[in-house]
């Protein structure tokens, strides 16, 4: 998932024997995903898992011994794995919050239910955008993100008024990324 442009792969690429590496910051626990097809999956917790300051990294066992000798111990996955991810003092409060979020997700019905809710949120928003002449989404439907939905108005001069009206209705932080403008709705699990 790429958050600025609101695109994501609609499939897991087949890369043969080459280890596939992915940043799952926005996709972690958004729906069931087959992580066994990846060599490395990493991501910050701040989108779907918890507060900023915590990273979740999954490394396939056969890749642990491939670190270069000049890699500092803190970034050497082999060393981290040998120390049960406790080479340094872990961010305990962030891990505690991650645990609470995992409990909440189970209470919602688990990953299948979270995925169904996220798909419904995204579908509803895309349908509203696509059925209107007032809004536009630049991403081809097959490559659209479930988590980050960029859109523009037919008249960009209305952007400021739209954002103010949205804020009055309780919809905040919709301003698009500075590099692309427009609007962007981030609809992570907690939304």
Language-model-derived ranges and their functions:
Residues 149-155, 171-191:
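Conserved PLP-binding active-site segment of the aspartate aminotransferase-like
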Residues 45-127, 140:
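Active-site C-terminal subdomain of aminotransferase-like
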Residues 5-11, 30-36, 52-55, 67-70:
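A short secondary-structure junction signal
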Residues 21, 35-46:
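Conserved active-site segment immediately N-terminal to the catalytic lysine
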Residues 1-28:
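Active-site phosphate-binding strand-loop segment of PLP-dependent enzymes
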Residues 40-42, 54-58, 148-150:
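Conserved hydrophobic/aromatic beta-strand scaffold that supports enzyme active sites
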Residues 135-166:
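Conserved PLP-binding catalytic core of the aspartate aminotransferase-like
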Residues 11-15, 32-36, 47-51, 141-142, ...:
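Solvent-exposed alpha-helices and their adjacent loops that cap or buttress functional pockets
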């Amino acid at each position: 998932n790429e958050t600025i442009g609101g695109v994501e792969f609609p499939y897991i690429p087949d890369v043969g024997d080459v280890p596939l590496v992915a940043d799952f910051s926005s996709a972690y626990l958004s729906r069931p995903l087959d992580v066994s097809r990846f060599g490395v999956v990493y991501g910050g917790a701040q989108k779907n898992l918890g507060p900023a300051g915590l990273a979740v990294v999954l490394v396939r066992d056969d890749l642990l011994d491939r670190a270069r000798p000049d890699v500092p111990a803190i970034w050497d996955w082999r060393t981290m794995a040998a120390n049960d991810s406790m080479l340094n003092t872990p961010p305990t409060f962030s891990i505690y919050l991650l645990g609470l979020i995992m409990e909440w997700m189970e209470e919602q019905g688990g990953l299948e239910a979270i995925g169904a809710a996220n798909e419904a949120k995204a579908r509803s928003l895309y349908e509203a955008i696509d059925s209107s002449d007032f809004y536009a989404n630049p991403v081809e439907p097959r490559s659209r993100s479930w988590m980050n939905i960029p859109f523009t108005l037919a008249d960009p001069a209305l952007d400021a008024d739209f954002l103010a009206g949205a804020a009055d209705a309780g919809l905040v932080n919709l301003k698009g990324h500075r590099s692309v403008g427009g609007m962007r709705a981030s609809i992570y699990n907690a939304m």
